Amino acid sequence: ETNFREWKLVLQEIVRFLKVDTTFMDVKPLRYCAKFDTYPASLSHVARFHAKRVLKLNDALLTSYHRNEVKFTELTLDTFRMLQCLEWEPSGAFFQLRTAEPDNHVTSNGHTEASGLIDINLAMDMTDPTLPLNPRKAILYRPAATHLVSVIATICEELPPDSIFLIYISASGKTGKTAGASSHIQTVGASRNSLNNKVDSHSFRGSDEVDSHDCDGDYLWLGPKGSAGSNNLYPDDLLPFTRRPLFLIVDSDNSHAFKAIHGAERGETAALLLSPRKPAFWGSSSAGDPSKNGSQFTLFLTAPLQAFCQLVGLTCSDIDKDVYNKADEILSSAFSEWEIKLCKPYSLDLVWAQVLPDPFLRRLILRFIFCRSSLYLFCLREDGEEYLPDCLPKLPNDVSPSSEAMQSNIHQLSECLGVASHFNFDIL
């Protein structure tokens, strides 16, 4: 009976996971695919780009915990998306037909008469020889802070020279009981009445007891395990590991507390991508509940066009396939333009320049730029910075969301999807 209940829970988690993860079915893979994620117009610029030092993504640590978040077993939706984002998409070269003598059940071309399926040699090493090795990844679910720190220390100790270590943490900055998604309507006056429907939603998840002191802390809450101190990860906990190159992604309502790392490093300046403290959405506030859909910031980093559609309240049933493909072409063209801007000599901080040649990290940087520009133009100026992501060190002004070129890219994309009225463009 116990096993039955456990398996029933696992099946329920898988059904819930698949329901959220398959919202947009006919889309590009989350994994890095040379066909979709390299751009002919900017390829030569990236190839010619040379920094004084070049770092390669070798290891990544991924951890996520939010109360009632979408997961199955110990793999959360946010971690799954980021895990896929740091993998190469196989080209298919490793699928080989098993050579076998034809018999009564198998034809000479490798098809079985009964099923018509191609036999695949599952015993072979499932590694695509045409691709580089994937970065090594460690996944932790609801770790104690001491456990997380010990794993980080082990990876840093073994990190090869000229490599960088990516740390992705998705967690709440508050401990407390989820009271449901709260929302409020943003209005902008008669001149922009169309924006009156914009709703931002923010829900934090934590333990059953609310501590007013915890709500103002400068830490991430990793889960209800052990004493309160063992659940909290502070920016200072990561400082000893800045003796090695770090690429830190913090997706939290308290992400900006980790700005304290910048300037306090012990040897290597860390690259920081920090999420907004609150998500923003058009229309239904339910879209902003991370316990139902995963994090908006992580979705922008792993599936940017899907995140943009979610931002403006579009679903797969709302978008014609040809329109979606056209929007994807516009976004790819924008990414290509931004790559060229980033490759300009002397315009990029060394911290970003040394990781730009790495395809995984370059793609994350481009998607961060897209996320920041989209949210900057979507949210009202008086909303403040809590709805905007941030990065340290700063990226060049050429890719600032206030620049005319960046706004033109977002305007073209929003026009294609018929949602230009949802944004505030300075260029119009």
Predicted regions and their residues:
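A short, glycine/acidic-enriched catalytic loop
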Residues: 173-241, 279
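Active-site-proximal C-terminal subdomain of hydrolase catalytic domains
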Residues: 247-376
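Eukaryotic intrinsically disordered and solvent-exposed regulatory patches
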Residues: 19-20, 32, 42-50, 69-70, ...
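C-terminal functional modules of predominantly eukaryotic multidomain proteins
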Residues: 86-87, 215, 220-223, 319-428
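Core residues of folded domains in eukaryotic genome-function proteins
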Residues: 56-59, 135, 161-166, 244-248, ...
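Functional beta-strand-loop-alpha-helix junction segments that form "active/interaction loops"
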Residues: 79, 86-166, 183-185, 207-208, ...
